[in-house]
Amino acid sequence: MNFDMSKLVQQAQKMQEQMKKAQQERENMEVIGESGAGLVTVTMTGKYDVKSVSIDNSLMSEDKEILEDLIAAAVNSAVKKVEENSTASSDIYKMAKDAGIDLPSGINFPFK
């Protein structure tokens, strides 16, 4: 078996660059979660920071608990969208494959 250390280092550097790019894309991402057929919307970044909450005026006369439930549902919707759009584990597998590294399946990466 011919082992080329410089090739392995180059592959690792390429994978590291791709991971940094994927992380930056996630941090710059914005998603909108909604509930109540769009009456409550939450804008969230890929870092899970809530940028804005919008509540339709028609809900202002509703019961406080209903409004709280709709806000919670909109936040949860936004969180789910961030997670769906940031497939860290599958990105790592793809990057490794592109770099010629065969990772075993079933590894749970901690940065999802």
Curated annotation (Swiss-Prot):
* Purpose of the protein: Binds to DNA and alters its conformation. May be involved in regulation of gene expression, nucleoid organization and DNA protection.
Q: Which superkingdom heads the taxonomic lineage of this protein's source?
A: Bacteria
Primary location group: cytoplasm
Is Transcription among the key words of this record? no
Provide GO CC annotations from the record.
bacterial nucleoid; cytosol
Localized where? Cytoplasm, Nucleoid
Descriptive protein name: Nucleoid-associated protein FTM_1023
- What terms describe the molecular function in GO for this protein? DNA binding
Q: Can you tell me which family this protein belongs to?
A: Belongs to the YbaB/EbfC family.
Assembly behavior? Homodimer.
Pfam families, alphabetized: YbaB_DNA_bd
Print the organism lineage.
Bacteria, Pseudomonadati, Pseudomonadota, Gammaproteobacteria, Thiotrichales
PANTHER family recorded: NUCLEOID-ASSOCIATED PROTEIN YBAB (PTHR33449:SF1)
Q: What keywords is this UniProt entry annotated with?
A: Cytoplasm, DNA-binding
